Swiss-Prot record:
InterPro entries: LS (IPR034964), LS/RS (IPR002180), LS/RS_sf (IPR036467). One of its GO terms (cellular component) is riboflavin synthase complex. It comes from Jannaschia sp. (strain CCS1). This is 6,7-dimethyl-8-ribityllumazine synthase. It holds the Pfam family DMRL_synthase. The gene is ribH. Belongs to the DMRL synthase family. The lineage of its organism: Bacteria, Pseudomonadati, Pseudomonadota, Alphaproteobacteria, Rhodobacterales.
Amino acid sequence: MAGHSDNDLGLPSFDKPVKVAIVIAPYYTSISEAQLAAARGVLDAADVAHETIEVPGSLEVPTAIGIAHRMSNFDGFVALGCVIRGATSHYDVVVNESSRALTMLGLQGICIGNGIITVETRDQAEERADGGRLNTAGGAAEAALHLIALTRSYGAPKGALGFKPRGTIEIADGSSQA
């Protein structure tokens, strides 16, 4: 995720339309509203089409992204939510597992900006959700756009990994086997 930094890459430009899904766990309403406004602002500024998908909690964000990636035509995703430490170890599970799952999806080539806020206090969450302050959601939207631009700069995928259909096996000498 892009965040508060002195390094401003600016927004990438695209020669073909881009479609992004904002996947958010709106557990804390006021924080979620600020996150959505910030992410949408960045995507609108880049003239990028976007849709919003709501899920119950931050643990469901990666699953929703995986489903949407397989079942739709989104070029990238912005993961949003907020996890504030409580009195139990549940915070650690949610923070670690949602981050791990988003990273695993990213390593599979899915363009994701991670804007899930993980903090100790509500004040810290509000500071990070504020589009005029730390703006983690806007930074996540920018990160997703930069990953989409990077992916497009390399052209079409080189091909799928896995088994070829029966009858398409190629032998080293150039012949094929049915």
